[in-house]
Regions:
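Acidic/histidine-rich, surface-exposed loop or edge segments in extracytoplasmic proteins
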Residues: 64-96, 122-132
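Short N-terminal segments immediately surrounding and downstream of signal-peptide cleavage
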Residues: 37-66
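Hydrophobic/aromatic-rich core segments of domains that either
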Residues: 151-215
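Mid-length scaffold segments of soluble, non-membrane domains
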Residues: 98-162
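N-terminal secretory signal peptides that target proteins for export/translocation
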Residues: 1-12
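Sec/Tat signal peptide C-region and signal peptidase I cleavage site
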Residues: 31-36
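Active-site-adjacent structural elements in enzyme catalytic domains
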Residues: 42-48, 104-107, 111, 137, ...
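Bacterial N-terminal signal peptides
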Residues: 18-28
Length: 219
């Protein structure tokens, strides 16, 4: 994905400060300090880099328009929470089942926000070359949105087999690999990392879920 934003790991110093800034933002948003402090510097930087609050148990900022140039607040209703709880209940039996449930939860999010944002018109692998930012996510938007949704599911106690991991980056210009980012889940038992990548998929299509080791080799 092509855009002007730096890689997530571009500056170690910046991510350290971003982690502190993310805690401050969360505190101002009313998130308990203990929860805010649990954000890693890499996750906190997703939010501080575009001056938005991390998600709370009741709301999240939804980014679109490429690098979060457009944004909308999703206030979770009782119906939203019930729908996501039912979706995730199907994944309690195993880690693989939970990853499949997460795919359905991301599709739920896509359907929930599509008509509100206009992203029900979005295309797969969108970037600035499509000249339609108002209807699309770039990979920075999908990384932020998916990470936020996963953090909410985690806060609600709906992730039994996984924890939310640090976002991952790929992009090897020597082999013409396009720069790209994604959200990540970490298996609590095996510590294996799994990407949850919505950007390569169109509206209402399930996100890619695969081991990070495989994802970093794709384009």
């Amino acid at each position: 994905m092509l855009d002007a934003a730096p890689p997530i790991w571009a500056s170690r110093t910046r991510t350290i400060f971003a982690g502190l800034f993310g805690v401050v933002l969360a505190a101002l948003a009313g998130v308990p300090a203990a929860k805010a402090a649990e954000l890693s510097s890499a996750v906190a930087y997703l939010y501080s880099s575009v001056s938005i609050y991390p998600p709370s148990a009741s709301a999240m900022t939804v980014c679109y328009g490429f690098v979060c140039r457009r944004r909308e607040i999703l206030d979770f209703s009782a119906g939203d929470r019930n729908a996501l709880t039912q979706i995730m209940a199907a994944g309690r039996a195993s880690a693989a089942a939970e990853r499949a449930a997460v795919q359905k939860a991301v599709v739920w999010f896509d359907r929930r926000m599509g008509p509100i944002l206009g992203t029900n018109k979005r295309v797969a692998k969108a970037d600035f070359r499509y000249f339609d930012d108002k209807h699309n996510f770039d990979c920075w938007d999908t990384t932020r949105n998916t990470t936020s949704l996963l953090l909410v599911l985690q806060e609600w106690g709906l992730l039994k087999h996984h924890a939310v991991g640090d976002p991952k980056y790929r992009g090897n210009t020597l082999v013409l690999q396009t720069p790209h980012n994604t959200a990540v889940l970490v298996d609590r038992v095996t510590k294996a990392e799994w990407v949850v990548d919505l950007w390569p998929r169109g509206y209402l299509q399930p996100p890619d879920v695969m081991p990070v080791e495989k994802w970093v080799k794709e384009d």
